[in-house]
Amino acid sequence: MLHGMSPECALSKLLSSLEFHTLYRYTMTQKHNFPSNNKDTLHLPRILCLHGGGTNARIFRAQCRALEKALRTSFRLCYAEALFPSQPGPDVTAVYRDFGPFRAWIDSPDANPVTMTEALQISICKAIMEDDQRGATGPVVGLLGFSQGAKVCASLILEQQLLGRTFGDHSHLPFRLPQWRFAVLLAGRGPLVTLSHLSVGADIMQKMAHLCENDDSSGLDSQENLGNVILTRELIQVPTIHVHGRKDPALDLHRKLYYDDFDPRYSKVMEWDGAHRVPLKSKDVATLVKEINVLWASVSHSNVQG
Protein backbone atom coordinates (compact mmCIF):
# COMPACT_ATOMS: atom_id res chain seq x y z
CA MET A 1 0.00 0.00 0.00
CA LEU A 2 1.04 3.63 -0.51
CA HIS A 3 1.82 5.62 2.60
CA GLY A 4 -0.81 8.05 3.80
CA MET A 5 -3.34 7.31 1.06
CA SER A 6 -4.80 4.27 -0.64
CA PRO A 7 -3.85 3.74 -4.30
CA GLU A 8 -7.50 4.29 -5.28
CA CYS A 9 -7.62 7.69 -3.54
CA ALA A 10 -4.20 8.64 -4.90
CA LEU A 11 -5.35 7.85 -8.42
CA SER A 12 -8.48 9.93 -7.97
CA LYS A 13 -6.45 12.89 -6.75
CA LEU A 14 -3.92 12.59 -9.55
CA LEU A 15 -6.63 12.51 -12.19
CA SER A 16 -8.09 15.90 -11.34
CA SER A 17 -6.71 17.36 -14.59
CA LEU A 18 -8.77 16.82 -17.74
CA GLU A 19 -5.59 16.10 -19.69
CA PHE A 20 -5.32 12.68 -18.09
CA HIS A 21 -8.91 11.43 -18.09
CA THR A 22 -8.90 9.96 -21.59
CA LEU A 23 -5.43 8.44 -21.28
CA TYR A 24 -6.23 6.98 -17.87
CA ARG A 25 -9.55 5.45 -18.98
CA TYR A 26 -7.81 3.76 -21.89
CA THR A 27 -4.97 2.46 -19.72
CA MET A 28 -7.26 1.08 -17.02
CA THR A 29 -9.20 -0.95 -19.59
CA GLN A 30 -6.06 -2.70 -20.85
CA LYS A 31 -5.40 -6.16 -19.45
CA HIS A 32 -1.83 -7.19 -18.78
CA ASN A 33 -2.86 -10.86 -19.06
CA PHE A 34 -0.17 -11.83 -16.61
CA PRO A 35 -0.41 -15.31 -15.16
CA SER A 36 -1.05 -15.33 -11.43
CA ASN A 37 2.12 -15.04 -9.41
CA ASN A 38 3.07 -17.80 -7.03
CA LYS A 39 0.80 -17.35 -4.03
CA ASP A 40 3.77 -18.14 -1.80
CA THR A 41 5.17 -14.69 -2.63
CA LEU A 42 2.12 -12.67 -1.53
CA HIS A 43 3.61 -11.80 1.86
CA LEU A 44 7.12 -10.99 0.61
CA PRO A 45 8.58 -7.50 0.22
CA ARG A 46 7.92 -6.19 -3.26
CA ILE A 47 10.16 -4.76 -5.97
CA LEU A 48 8.43 -2.49 -8.47
CA CYS A 49 9.72 -3.13 -12.00
CA LEU A 50 9.85 -0.49 -14.75
CA HIS A 51 10.23 -1.72 -18.32
CA GLY A 52 12.38 -0.22 -21.06
CA GLY A 53 11.10 2.31 -23.56
CA GLY A 54 9.17 0.85 -26.48
CA THR A 55 8.11 -2.29 -24.59
CA ASN A 56 5.52 -2.83 -21.83
CA ALA A 57 4.98 -4.59 -18.52
CA ARG A 58 4.05 -7.89 -20.15
CA ILE A 59 7.25 -7.96 -22.19
CA PHE A 60 9.37 -6.96 -19.20
CA ARG A 61 7.98 -9.77 -17.14
CA ALA A 62 8.95 -12.20 -19.90
CA GLN A 63 12.42 -10.66 -20.00
CA CYS A 64 12.74 -10.98 -16.20
CA ARG A 65 11.40 -14.54 -16.02
CA ALA A 66 14.69 -16.09 -14.86
CA LEU A 67 15.34 -13.31 -12.36
CA GLU A 68 11.80 -13.46 -10.96
CA LYS A 69 12.04 -17.21 -10.51
CA ALA A 70 15.38 -16.94 -8.72
CA LEU A 71 14.07 -14.22 -6.38
CA ARG A 72 10.81 -15.98 -5.51
CA THR A 73 11.88 -16.91 -1.97
CA SER A 74 12.98 -13.35 -1.15
CA PHE A 75 10.87 -10.89 -3.13
CA ARG A 76 7.70 -10.49 -5.12
CA LEU A 77 8.10 -8.60 -8.39
CA CYS A 78 5.37 -6.15 -9.37
CA TYR A 79 5.34 -4.73 -12.91
CA ALA A 80 4.23 -1.20 -13.77
CA GLU A 81 3.29 -0.11 -17.29
CA ALA A 82 4.03 3.32 -18.76
CA LEU A 83 1.16 5.39 -20.15
CA PHE A 84 2.71 7.04 -23.20
CA PRO A 85 2.26 5.23 -26.55
CA SER A 86 5.53 4.40 -28.30
CA GLN A 87 7.07 2.70 -31.28
CA PRO A 88 8.64 -0.66 -30.36
CA GLY A 89 12.18 -0.43 -29.05
CA PRO A 90 15.25 -1.80 -30.83
CA ASP A 91 15.05 -5.58 -31.46
CA VAL A 92 11.69 -5.79 -29.66
CA THR A 93 9.68 -6.90 -32.68
CA ALA A 94 12.05 -9.79 -33.39
CA VAL A 95 10.61 -11.64 -30.39
CA TYR A 96 7.67 -9.61 -29.09
CA ARG A 97 6.00 -8.34 -32.26
CA ASP A 98 2.55 -9.46 -31.07
CA PHE A 99 2.97 -8.21 -27.50
CA GLY A 100 1.87 -4.60 -28.08
CA PRO A 101 0.78 -1.95 -27.50
CA PHE A 102 4.23 -0.57 -26.75
CA ARG A 103 4.82 2.11 -24.14
CA ALA A 104 7.39 4.64 -22.95
CA TRP A 105 7.92 6.47 -19.67
CA ILE A 106 9.10 9.64 -21.40
CA ASP A 107 6.75 11.18 -23.95
CA SER A 108 9.41 13.28 -25.69
CA PRO A 109 12.87 14.72 -24.93
CA ASP A 110 11.28 18.04 -23.89
CA ALA A 111 8.39 16.45 -22.00
CA ASN A 112 6.57 18.57 -19.43
CA PRO A 113 7.85 17.41 -16.00
CA VAL A 114 4.37 17.78 -14.46
CA THR A 115 2.71 15.67 -17.15
CA MET A 116 5.41 13.00 -16.98
CA THR A 117 5.37 12.89 -13.18
CA GLU A 118 1.57 12.52 -13.05
CA ALA A 119 1.71 9.74 -15.65
CA LEU A 120 4.45 7.97 -13.69
CA GLN A 121 2.49 8.22 -10.45
CA ILE A 122 -0.61 6.81 -12.14
CA SER A 123 1.37 3.85 -13.47
CA ILE A 124 2.91 3.11 -10.08
CA CYS A 125 -0.42 3.45 -8.25
CA LYS A 126 -2.16 1.19 -10.74
CA ALA A 127 0.51 -1.51 -10.53
CA ILE A 128 0.48 -1.59 -6.73
CA MET A 129 -3.32 -1.42 -6.52
CA GLU A 130 -3.72 -4.36 -8.92
CA ASP A 131 -1.12 -6.36 -7.00
CA ASP A 132 -2.91 -5.60 -3.73
CA GLN A 133 -6.10 -6.90 -5.32
CA ARG A 134 -4.32 -10.15 -6.14
CA GLY A 135 -3.68 -10.53 -2.42
CA ALA A 136 -0.17 -9.13 -2.07
CA THR A 137 0.52 -7.69 1.36
CA GLY A 138 4.28 -7.15 1.45
CA PRO A 139 5.70 -3.62 1.56
CA VAL A 140 7.01 -2.11 -1.67
CA VAL A 141 10.68 -1.61 -0.84
CA GLY A 142 12.68 -1.43 -4.05
CA LEU A 143 12.86 -0.55 -7.72
CA LEU A 144 14.19 -2.50 -10.68
CA GLY A 145 14.42 -0.86 -14.07
CA PHE A 146 15.86 -1.65 -17.48
CA SER A 147 17.17 0.95 -19.96
CA GLN A 148 14.66 3.86 -19.96
CA GLY A 149 13.04 2.25 -16.92
CA ALA A 150 16.41 2.38 -15.14
CA LYS A 151 16.73 6.08 -15.97
CA VAL A 152 13.30 6.67 -14.42
CA CYS A 153 14.17 4.56 -11.35
CA ALA A 154 17.31 6.63 -10.81
CA SER A 155 15.25 9.81 -11.18
CA LEU A 156 12.72 8.55 -8.62
CA ILE A 157 15.34 7.83 -5.97
CA LEU A 158 17.01 11.19 -6.58
CA GLU A 159 13.64 12.89 -6.15
CA GLN A 160 13.05 10.94 -2.93
CA GLN A 161 16.44 12.02 -1.61
CA LEU A 162 15.83 15.68 -2.49
CA LEU A 163 12.31 15.62 -1.05
CA GLY A 164 13.49 14.13 2.23
CA ARG A 165 16.29 16.67 2.51
CA THR A 166 13.98 19.60 1.77
CA PHE A 167 10.86 18.69 3.75
CA GLY A 168 12.11 16.10 6.23
CA ASP A 169 9.06 14.10 7.30
CA HIS A 170 6.75 14.62 4.32
CA SER A 171 3.95 12.32 5.46
CA HIS A 172 1.64 15.37 5.45
CA LEU A 173 1.85 15.66 1.67
CA PRO A 174 -1.33 14.67 -0.23
CA PHE A 175 0.43 11.94 -2.22
CA ARG A 176 3.41 9.78 -1.40
CA LEU A 177 5.09 7.06 -3.36
CA PRO A 178 6.54 4.13 -1.43
CA GLN A 179 9.86 4.70 0.28
CA TRP A 180 12.42 3.24 -2.08
CA ARG A 181 14.98 1.45 0.09
CA PHE A 182 17.13 0.38 -2.86
CA ALA A 183 17.18 0.21 -6.66
CA VAL A 184 18.57 -2.18 -9.25
CA LEU A 185 19.47 -0.35 -12.47
CA LEU A 186 20.03 -2.48 -15.56
CA ALA A 187 21.61 -0.70 -18.53
CA GLY A 188 20.58 2.75 -17.36
CA ARG A 189 21.95 5.94 -18.90
CA GLY A 190 21.68 9.64 -18.16
CA PRO A 191 20.64 12.30 -18.07
CA LEU A 192 18.13 11.81 -15.30
CA VAL A 193 14.66 13.21 -15.85
CA THR A 194 13.16 16.12 -13.97
CA LEU A 195 10.21 15.17 -11.77
CA SER A 196 9.75 18.42 -9.82
CA HIS A 197 11.27 21.82 -9.11
CA LEU A 198 13.63 20.04 -6.69
CA SER A 199 15.31 18.00 -9.41
CA VAL A 200 15.31 21.02 -11.73
CA GLY A 201 17.59 22.72 -9.22
CA ALA A 202 19.79 19.66 -8.87
CA ASP A 203 20.00 19.31 -12.64
CA ILE A 204 21.06 22.94 -13.10
CA MET A 205 23.71 22.60 -10.41
CA GLN A 206 24.98 19.39 -11.96
CA LYS A 207 25.32 21.05 -15.36
CA MET A 208 27.22 23.93 -13.73
CA ALA A 209 29.54 21.46 -12.05
CA HIS A 210 30.25 19.67 -15.33
CA LEU A 211 31.02 22.99 -17.03
CA CYS A 212 33.41 23.99 -14.28
CA GLU A 213 35.14 20.60 -14.34
CA ASN A 214 35.70 20.80 -18.10
CA ASP A 215 36.43 24.50 -18.62
CA ASP A 216 39.48 26.23 -17.13
CA SER A 217 38.07 29.62 -18.18
CA SER A 218 35.00 29.30 -15.98
CA GLY A 219 35.38 32.87 -14.75
CA LEU A 220 35.19 31.89 -11.10
CA ASP A 221 37.32 33.99 -8.80
CA SER A 222 39.23 31.18 -7.13
CA GLN A 223 39.76 27.45 -6.89
CA GLU A 224 37.89 27.59 -3.59
CA ASN A 225 34.76 28.84 -5.36
CA LEU A 226 35.15 26.12 -7.99
CA GLY A 227 35.26 23.52 -5.25
CA ASN A 228 32.11 24.87 -3.66
CA VAL A 229 30.20 24.56 -6.91
CA ILE A 230 31.34 20.98 -7.53
CA LEU A 231 30.48 19.94 -4.00
CA THR A 232 26.90 21.09 -4.45
CA ARG A 233 26.33 18.47 -7.14
CA GLU A 234 23.78 15.98 -5.84
CA LEU A 235 25.08 12.41 -5.68
CA ILE A 236 22.47 9.73 -5.08
CA GLN A 237 22.92 7.94 -1.76
CA VAL A 238 20.02 5.50 -1.96
CA PRO A 239 21.66 2.02 -2.16
CA THR A 240 21.90 0.78 -5.73
CA ILE A 241 23.18 -2.05 -7.89
CA HIS A 242 24.23 -1.10 -11.43
CA VAL A 243 24.11 -3.95 -13.94
CA HIS A 244 26.11 -3.38 -17.13
CA GLY A 245 26.50 -5.69 -20.10
CA ARG A 246 30.08 -5.60 -21.40
CA LYS A 247 28.81 -6.14 -24.96
CA ASP A 248 26.22 -3.38 -24.73
CA PRO A 249 26.96 -0.68 -27.34
CA ALA A 250 26.02 1.96 -24.74
CA LEU A 251 28.27 0.56 -21.98
CA ASP A 252 30.23 3.81 -21.69
CA LEU A 253 27.00 5.74 -21.11
CA HIS A 254 25.89 3.30 -18.42
CA ARG A 255 29.21 3.66 -16.64
CA LYS A 256 28.97 7.43 -16.97
CA LEU A 257 25.60 7.48 -15.20
CA TYR A 258 27.14 5.56 -12.30
CA TYR A 259 30.24 7.75 -12.00
CA ASP A 260 28.44 11.06 -12.50
CA ASP A 261 25.35 10.63 -10.35
CA PHE A 262 25.92 8.01 -7.63
CA ASP A 263 27.84 8.07 -4.38
CA PRO A 264 30.17 5.03 -4.61
CA ARG A 265 29.79 4.42 -0.88
CA TYR A 266 26.18 3.36 -1.46
CA SER A 267 26.37 1.69 -4.85
CA LYS A 268 27.90 -1.35 -6.50
CA VAL A 269 28.55 -2.25 -10.14
CA MET A 270 27.99 -5.71 -11.60
CA GLU A 271 29.24 -6.21 -15.14
CA TRP A 272 28.36 -9.34 -17.07
CA ASP A 273 29.21 -10.82 -20.45
CA GLY A 274 26.08 -9.73 -22.28
CA ALA A 275 24.53 -7.10 -24.55
CA HIS A 276 21.58 -4.73 -24.04
CA ARG A 277 19.19 -7.09 -22.32
CA VAL A 278 18.19 -8.56 -18.96
CA PRO A 279 20.46 -11.42 -17.83
CA LEU A 280 18.95 -14.85 -18.46
CA LYS A 281 21.76 -17.37 -17.98
CA SER A 282 21.70 -19.08 -14.60
CA LYS A 283 25.25 -17.97 -13.70
CA ASP A 284 24.54 -14.29 -14.35
CA VAL A 285 21.14 -14.43 -12.68
CA ALA A 286 22.58 -16.15 -9.60
CA THR A 287 25.24 -13.45 -9.27
CA LEU A 288 22.65 -10.67 -9.50
CA VAL A 289 20.28 -12.37 -7.05
CA LYS A 290 23.10 -12.74 -4.54
CA GLU A 291 23.92 -9.03 -4.85
CA ILE A 292 20.26 -8.07 -4.37
CA ASN A 293 19.88 -10.27 -1.30
CA VAL A 294 23.12 -8.98 0.24
CA LEU A 295 22.05 -5.39 -0.38
CA TRP A 296 18.61 -5.97 1.13
CA ALA A 297 20.12 -7.64 4.19
CA SER A 298 22.40 -4.64 4.66
CA VAL A 299 19.58 -2.12 4.20
CA SER A 300 17.27 -4.00 6.57
CA HIS A 301 20.00 -4.35 9.20
CA SER A 302 20.92 -0.67 9.07
CA ASN A 303 17.28 0.32 9.60
CA VAL A 304 16.94 -2.04 12.57
CA GLN A 305 20.14 -0.66 14.07
CA GLY A 306 18.94 2.90 13.48
Curated annotation (Swiss-Prot):
Its EC number is 3.1.2.-. Belongs to the LovG family. Esterase; part of the gene cluster that mediates the biosynthesis of the tropolone class of fungal maleic anhydrides. The pathway begins with the synthesis of 3-methylorcinaldehyde by the non-reducing polyketide synthase (PKS) tropA. 3-methylorcinaldehyde is the substrate for the FAD-dependent monooxygenase tropB to yield a dearomatized hydroxycyclohexadione. The 2-oxoglutarate-dependent dioxygenase tropC then performs the oxidative ring expansion to provide the first tropolone metabolite stipitaldehyde. InterPro entries: AB_hydrolase_fold, FSH-like_dom, LovG. The keyword Hydrolase applies. It comes from the Eukaryota. Pathway: Secondary metabolite biosynthesis. One of its GO terms (cellular component) is nucleus. PANTHER family: ESTERASE DBAE-RELATED, ESTERASE OVCA2. The active site is at residues 147, 248, 276. The lineage of its organism: Eukaryota, Fungi, Dikarya, Ascomycota, Pezizomycotina. This is Esterase tropF. GO terms for biological process: secondary metabolite biosynthetic process. GO terms for molecular function: hydrolase activity.
